[in-house]
Curated annotation (Swiss-Prot):
Chief localization: cytoplasm
GO cellular component: cellular bud; cytosol; endoplasmic reticulum; Golgi cis cisterna; membrane; mitochondrion
Domain notes: The SEC7 domain is sufficient for stimulation of nucleotide exchange on myristoylated yeast ARF2.
SEC7 domain residues: 552-706
Additional note from the record: Present with 2940 molecules/cell in log phase SD medium.
Membrane topology: Peripheral membrane protein
Gene3D superfamilies per record: 1.10.220.20, Arf Nucleotide-binding Site Opener,domain 2
Name of protein: ARF guanine-nucleotide exchange factor 1
GO biological process: actin cytoskeleton organization; endoplasmic reticulum to Golgi vesicle-mediated transport; intra-Golgi vesicle-mediated transport; macroautophagy; regulation of ARF protein signal transduction; retrograde vesicle-mediated transport, Golgi to endoplasmic reticulum
Location within or outside the cell: Cytoplasm, Cytosol; Membrane; Endoplasmic reticulum; Mitochondrion
SMART domains reported for this sequence: Sec7 (SM00222)
Provenance organism: Saccharomyces cerevisiae (strain ATCC 204508 / S288c) (Baker's yeast)
Region Disordered: start-end pairs: 262-287
Subunit and partners: Interacts (via N-terminal region) with SEC21 (via C-terminus). Interacts with GMH1. Interacts with DRS2.
């Protein structure tokens, strides 16, 4: 409730309302009175009416019906007095709040009043507080509110029916809740609040009360709990570091019996009656005396206000926790009902949820949580089978883990370990509890799920705090393994159906969290910047550390040496050893430590060890409690003496400058009597005093808690034993009483204590937990270690986690995926597998990555061997291809397509498989085995016509080489159909035979399979991922080439070879390391091209591949020679004119000459005569002539040529054929001449110009062969020179006049030039005439040559002969041969004249 202005709440004067309430109450009380008139008059008299008070007693006695003072009712009187006072004052402004409330409070607390009247009074009080009739403006508001709450907690009335009584108490509880949860509640003190808590909680826990009342009490106590612990968040924590020694009893705050409401005894009634009589007597006092009494009361009230108890705070919060603890403590489990325990747990949980983060600032509060409350939680978890109780307990446990987990590591570890044992159905030795039923285990898992739902980094936090701690177990890893184990559907057999999905959610949350973290950090940056983390290095050595510890526990000396050797102890110095024993003793046997320290030879080690403690500000017993958390005190007196002596010295030194400060000294708390100022002194015992006192404490602890001791030591006995032991005097009595009480209340628990199976739980708790909760310090600035980690450090921790659980997680996921019946679950699991694969890839867990992808591949059904696949196929059908004409689509039906199409999980795996492959950016992670599977899957799809290979990956290559699309495997049966319909299959019978006919269902499955493969993008995912291409991939592709044709692979043998070769060629052509594989793939290609039975198209395609290798990889393995010798020159039925004129044939030749233009002539192919033979064949294709000429021109005219005899003759033949090709030009020449003769317009251009020009250039090259002789590194021999002359001479007969005359002119220039190098000793000039020029006149072609050309030839012949004659290098035989030539044509006048000129010139030359 919130305070608001009065006028906004009430429409009537508050005084009027109070008067009405007084009248109503009086009326009700009068009706219930035996004599209404007496009661009324008594009320009037008791009310102090001026009519009666001003008269004498005789006047009053005249009223025969008025009772004596002994029958006056003070309750009614109080109401009447309040009404009259309000009337006199004309309002409430001059009244105190307590005056206003007092009459109502008296009725509430009066046991003689009926429940009905009490209910009316409660209604009035409810209105007063709800309608803000009293508020903070009243001076005595604090006292009024406190008195009200006190009256409510002590409410009494006459008993009646149970339901009626509970209805009254219901109003009490409701009003208490309204007051305390409003701002009025801030005025209450610790004592009052605690009283309210006791009252309300006792009502809530009393099963004899009605359900409504108990539930209302529960709501009230919950509201008060919220109020209290909300205030805890607002309190200022202690300003100095506070140490709290846990030596108090937790059983002081017990829940009291429910006594509110009805009267419990007749004595109370009589007491109440006596009080009423006295009250009535007082009310008959004179007015003056009444005024004096009121003044005295006011003075007392004022004095009380000055010494009033402060408003509630931390004290009642601590006491309240203790009260709640008393309901759930193991030793009280038989005293309280399950519902009471459940309520207590829920309230503690609410307290933790509200202000649990503030508990570490208050050591006393935190100590309650860390020890007794957590102990009770663990006990209930391990022993209870009550569902509701266990549910509340687990809710509290999860709240403690979430909010205070960083402060309670060992408590959490012990509890989770016990929970694991419960889930595993294992029992602890001595545990008499039965195995938990499935519903309980399900509840445990449900509640635990809050941990990972609350914090995605829960497992990471566990890993850092536990798994990386040498003294703690691998809690995170074991937790995850437990979840994976119970995620399997099989776990539901022994548990419940809900446990597997809950546990699976936990596993998936871990995967999701790691995956999300990885998405925020680049992998390359992680690999580059990851560093060694000391904690992770420590984690890696944990197994080694445990081995050392086990050795230590067996034999300390050997263990110490081993710890030093392994680097866990820095050196063999006593300081380093002591420091290790002090800081890292979680796994060390405390008894072994104690025996080591008390060794007479280890005195210095003992001193170093004791010096590590800080005993400042502690009593001796408190210091001993702390001391004995680190080791177990030995049993022999001499050993104890050494340790106590060292302790005494250290303790005395620590106290030399500090006094022992105890919070409750002055208050005398826990003392037998209140202390005076003289008792408050500084207690500073010397070493000897501490030695004696320490021994006495150890003996007292044994005496008080040893069950075999029957007569326990009293305080007097104890104090008498220590007389004169405090620096020669007696210890202060209060000091010894503190020690005595502390030991009596709280045993000093010795580590490694064992009391047998009956007390195994106590031993387990004390040995693992109590040692850390003996002293609690305020922890103000503690921060979660995870919050301090950089992102890359978090990833390294997650890497360590996943490395330990990846295999079991993936194994579990695959098992669940295999048996999952829901598509939704399958998708969820597959998504998790995908993320696990990415995590493996990110962290470079190569083996796990490959195993996962391989497993996925196996689940696609595509990686199954043929034999296994056949086993799975019930009815084997051939590969059927259905072509639907109206859509142009094809449907392939096969065993493989049906298997894939009918298995939805296999389809999912197929899509995911290629998606994972597509995302690989580091091919080094892919193993050879995985590469083999990838290729196997792709080939399986190719063989079954389930994918289209003509993607951009291939089409670009095809465009470059002008190749047609890759051929696909031939189906066993092909069907064409005008359109696809459901009745399609009814027409198959005419095409198919018997059992080979696919069913309608098979076609549907095949369509699904095709769509799945289409969505997977297998080819682009693998081969268009440039980052994925690697030498290992190429090797796998090439090793997959099968060059042996069998009955099994015959349908796709050739197509698959081409498919793999083409992929390999494309990949190596784009890779930087392609040269490494050029020779290898060339070898494969040569072997394949030599196979028998290849189709013409395949051989032609292989030729393009070979030529591509020649041009791209510099002719590896001289594959060009193989192409020419074994393909172009041999397989003429394939490589013919039609081929060379085709697009891909043209491209091959272009690539060939492009390659030859870029290499030196000494390449092997150019020295091969078969190459030149190939060129001769090539020029038969007109489109290729220019390419051949260009090649020849470059390598002949540029010089530096090496040609052998065979090559030279082939060159001449090529040139001669190319020169002859220009003969077609004679057609145009004849047409031109005829047009001129006829007077017609001559043709504008020669359509054969390009051919004529090419032939003309060939003639020039032939001439150049002779003109360059001597300028090259190699000279022509006689035969080569003669052959060249013959070639030119042959072109003199070319039907094309232009070419014939060009050849004749070239021949003349060569033979007549003085600079001609043909004049050598190797070749006689007359031989050139006889063997080179003259033979052309014997050719048949001469018959078709025009006489004009013949006369030109004869003119040149004449010049050559005369020139030789002048030089004297000719003979008569030559002349006679020349003369015979002229005589053939002497009938022509021109020839006759030429002959006469020749003879005349010859004679003149001879004369000279």
């Amino acid at each position: 409730m919130h305070d608001v202005p009065m006028e906004t709440v009430l429409a009537v004067n508050p005084a009027t309302m109070i008067v009405k309430e007084c009248i109503n109450l009086c009326s009700a009380m009068n009706k219930q009175s035996r004599d209404k008139s007496q009661t009324s008059v008594a009320a009037l008299l008791g009310g102090g009416s001026d009519i009666f008070l001003s008269q004498s007693d005789s006047f009053v006695d005249s009223f025969h019906n008025l009772p004596t003072s002994s029958y006056h009712d003070p309750l009614i009187s109080g109401l009447v007095q309040l009404r009259l006072k309000i009337n006199d004052l004309k309002g409430l402004d001059s009244l105190n709040a307590l005056e206003l409330l007092k009459p109502f409070l008296e009725i509430v607390s009066a046991s003689s009043v009926s429940g009905y009247t009490t209910s009316l009074a409660l209604d009035s009080l409810q209105k007063v507080f709800t309608l803000k009739i009293i508020n903070k403006t009243f001076n005595d508001i604090q006292i009024a509110v406190r008195e009200t709450v006190v009256a409510l907690t002590h409410c009494r009335f006459e008993a009646s029916k149970q339901i009626s009584d509970d209805s009254v108490l219901l109003k009490v509880v409701t009003l208490l809740r309204d007051i305390i949860t409003s701002s009025f509640g801030d005025y209450l003190s610790d004592t009052i609040i605690y009283d309210v808590l006791q009252t309300t909680l006792s009502l809530a826990c009393n099963t004899q009360r009605s359900e409504v009342l108990r539930k209302t009490a529960e709501v009230t106590i919950a509201g008060i709990t919220v109020k209290l612990f909300t205030k805890l968040k607002l309190l200022d924590p202690p300003t100095k570091t506070e140490k709290y020694i846990n030596d108090e009893s937790y059983t002081d705050n017990n829940l009291k019996d429910d006594i509110i409401g009805t009267t419990t005894s007749d004595n109370d009634l009589s007491s109440t009656d006596d009080d009423s009589a006295v009250a009535d007597d007082n009310k008959n006092e004179k007015p003056v005396q009444q005024v004096i009494r009121e003044q005295e009361n006011d003075e007392e009230t004022a004095e009380k206000a000055e010494n009033v108890e402060p408003n509630y705070g931390i004290t009642v919060i601590k006491d309240y926790l203790g009260l709640l603890l008393s309901l759930v403590m193991p030793e009280n489990r038989m005293k309280h009902t399950t519902s009471a325990m459940k309520l207590s747990l829920q309230l503690i949980n609410a307290a933790i949820e509200i202000s649990g983060d503030k508990f570490p600032l208050y050591p006393r509060l935190f100590s309650l949580i860390s020890d007794p409350i957590f102990k009770s939680v663990l006990f209930i978890i391990q022993s209870s089978t009550q569902y509701s109780l266990l549910q509340a307990t687990l809710q509290l446990f999860t709240s403690l883990v979430v909010i205070l987990g960083d402060y309670l590591p060992m408590q959490i570890e012990l509890t989770l370990r016990r929970i694991f044992e419960i889930l595993e159905d294992t029992t602890i030795s001595g545990d008499v509890s039965k195995q938990k039923p499935p519903a309980i285990r399900e509840l445990i898992i449900e509640q635990l799920s809050i941990l990972w739902i609350h914090s995605p980094a829960f497992f990471l936090q566990l890993f850092v705090n536990f798994d990386c701690n040498l003294d703690r177990s691998d809690l995170s890893i074991d937790f995850i393994k437990e979840l994976t184990k119970f995620s399997l559907p099989a776990a539901a057999v022994n548990t419940s159906n809900n446990i597997p999905p809950i546990c699976l959610e936990g596993v998936l949350s871990l995967i999701e969290n790691i995956y999300n973290d990885l998405q925020r950090f680049d992998r390359a940056e992680f690999v580059k910047n990851q560093k060694e983390i000391d904690i992770l290095k420590q984690r890696d050595r944990k197994t080694e550390f445990i081995l050392c510890v086990e050795t230590f526990n067996e034999k300390a000396k050997k263990g110490i040496q081993m710890l030093i050797e392994k680097g866990f102890i820095d050196s063999d110095s006593n300081r380093d050893i002591a420091s290790f024993l002090f800081l890292n003793n979680g796994r060390l046997n405390k008894k072994t430590i104690g025996l080591l320290l008390c060794d007479p030879k280890k005195t210095s080690l003992l001193k170093e060890f004791i010096d590590l403690f800080d005993f400042k500000g502690l009593r001796v017993d408190e210091a001993i409690r702390i001391l004995l958390t680190k080791f177990r005190l030995p049993g022999e007196s001499q050993q104890i003496e050494r340790i106590v002596e060292a302790f005494s010295s250290k303790y005395s030194a620590d106290q030399s400058n500090d006094k022992v400060e105890l919070e409750d000294k002055k208050a005398g708390k826990n003392g037998s009597e209140s202390m005076t100022e003289d008792d408050i002194i500084h207690v500073q015992p010397d070493a000897d005093s501490v030695f004696v006192l320490s021994y006495s404490i150890i003996m007292l602890n044994t005496d008080s808690h040893n069950p075999q001791v029957k007569d326990h030591m009293t305080f007097d006995d104890y104090s008498n034993n220590l007389r004169g032991c405090y620096n020669g005097k007696d210890f202060p009595r209060w000091y010894l009483h503190k020690i005595y009480t502390s030991i009596k209340v709280k045993e000093i628990v010795m580590p490694e204590e064992h009391h047998g199976n009956e007390r195994w739980f106590e031993d387990a708790w004390n040995n693992l937990i109590s040692s850390t909760s003996v002293m609690t310090e305020m922890q103000r600035d503690f921060t979660n270690p995870i919050s301090k980690l950089a992102q890359i450090d978090i990833l390294q921790y997650e890497k360590a986690i996943f490395s330990n659980v990846r295999d079991i997680i993936l194994k579990t996921l695959f098992k669940i995926f295999t048996v999952a019946s829901s598509d939704q679950i399958s998708l969820r699991i597959l998504d998790a597998i995908s993320k696990c694969t990415f995590i493996n890839y990110y962290f470079s867990f190569d083996q796990s990555y490959n195993d996962t992808v391989l497993h996925l591949g196996e689940m696609t059904t595509l990686a199954q061997s043929s034999a296994k696949a056949v086993e799975l196929d019930v009815d084997s059908i051939p590969l059927v291809e259905i072509f639907v004409e109206d859509t142009g689509s094809k449907i392939s039906v096969s065993n493989q397509s049906i298997r894939l199409g009918q298995n939805f999980k296999a389809q999912l795996c197929t899509v995911l498989y290629f998606q994972i492959i597509k995302e690989i950016s580091d091919p080094s992670i892919v193993s050879t085995r995985l590469w083999n599977q990838i290729v196997q899957l792709i080939l399986k799809l190719f063989e079954n016509l389930l994918m289209e290979p003509n993607l951009p990956f291939f089409t670009n290559f095809h465009s470059l080489l002008k190749l047609p699309e890759l051929p696909l495997p031939d189906p066993d049966i092909s069907i064409r159909k005008a359109k696809m319909s459901r009745s399609l299959l009814s027409t198959f019978a005419s095409y198919l035979k018997g059992d080979e006919e696919p069913s309608e269902e098979d076609i549907d499955f095949s369509i699904k399979a095709f769509e799945c493969v289409k969505a997977s993008h297998p080819l682009s995912s693998v081969f268009e991922n440039n980052q994925l291409v690697s030498p290992k991939m190429i090797e796998t592709l090439l090793s997959s080439l099968v060059i042996e044709k069998t009955s099994e692979n015959s349908p796709y043998f050739e197509q698959e070879l081409l498919f793999l070769l083409e992929i390999s060629i494309i990949l190596i052509s784009e890779a930087s390391y392609g040269q490494e594989f050029g020779a290898l793939i060339a070898d494969h290609m040569i072997n394949i091209s030599n196979l028998d039975g290849l189709s013409k198209e395949a051989i032609a395609r292989l030729a393009s591949y070979k030529m591509f290798l020649v041009s791209r990889f510099d002719n590896p393995r001289d594959i060009l020679s193989d192409l020419i010798e074994h393909d172009f020159l041999v397989k003429n039925e394939i490589f013919n004119t039609k081929y060379y004129e085709s697009e891909w044939g043209k491209q091959v030749i272009n690539d060939l000459f492009t390659h030859l233009n870029d290499v030196k002539y000494n390449e092997r192919a150019l020295k091969n005569v078969k190459f030149w033979n190939f060129l001769r064949i090539l020029i038969s294709a007109k489109d290729r002539q220019f390419a051949v000429y260009t090649f020849l021109e470059k390598y002949i005219q540029n010089g530096d040529i090496f040609v052998d005899d065979g090559n030279f003759m082939n060159i001449l033949s090529l040139l001669d054929e190319m020169s002859c090709a220009g003969a077609v030009g004679t057609k145009w020449e004849q047409n031109y001449e005829n047009s001129v003769e006829d007077g017609c317009e001559a043709p504008e251009s020669n359509p054969y110009r390009s051919i004529i020009d090419l032939s003309s250039r060939s003639i020039n090259i032939t001439a150049d062969l002779l003109s360059t002789v001597g300028r090259s590194n190699s000279a022509l021999n006689k035969n080569e020179i003669i052959a060249a002359i013959q070639g030119l001479a042959h072109q003199c007969l070319n039907p094309c006049d232009e070419l014939g005359m060009q050849a004749l002119q070239a021949l003349e220039n060569i033979l007549l030039s003085r600079a001609s190098q043909l004049r050598t000793e190797k070749v006689a000039v007359d031989n050139l005439l006889e063997t080179g020029l003259l033979p052309i006149f014997e050719l048949d072609e001469i018959q078709d040559v025009k006489m004009k050309r013949i006369t030109s030839i004869l003119s040149v012949l004449s010049k050559i002969f005369l020139g030789q004659l002048v030089e004297g290098v000719t003979s008569n035989e030559t002349f006679l041969r020349v003369l015979n030539v002229f005589n053939k044509y002497v009938d022509d006048p021109t020839v006759e004249r030429q002959l006469q000129e020749l003879i005349i010139s010859k004679r003149e030359i001879e004369k000279e």
